[in-house]
Amino acid sequence: WYYKDGSLVTDTGIVSGNISRGNGSPDGIFKIAYKQKDATLVGENYASDVRYFMPFAYNVGIHDASWRSTFGKEIYKTSGSHGCINVPPKKAKKLFQTLQVGTPVIAYYREPVTLTAENTRISNAYSYKAETGL
């Protein structure tokens, strides 16, 4: 969900980090660090082109995922991302147009999750909080 001045701007199903592979998304309170159009997101074994990228915790951010046909429910448990928040392309465009740098991001899991992957440990809420003072 994205609320501005108490009103719902947009909502959508998402796909967060794949917890079965230890790539859970960081949970905590963050802010949009910057916005970038036409980015290539690069990891150890992938490179994904996205139209709209809005990072909030180091290299973890909200972006379109044109390669996905479904979003929401429990996809993240077995077919999630490398940690980013995947949203449908039309919703990513709407968010990109309406979010401002500095907009708060509240990320959480509904059930307890143990994050174990090295890249998740590096990008977790504690390290981000320590560096940014959030």
Describe the predicted segments one by one.
Residues G22-I29, Y34-L134:
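Exported/periplasmic cell-wall-interacting domains
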Residues W1-D27:
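Cell wall/extracellular polymer interaction/catalysis modules
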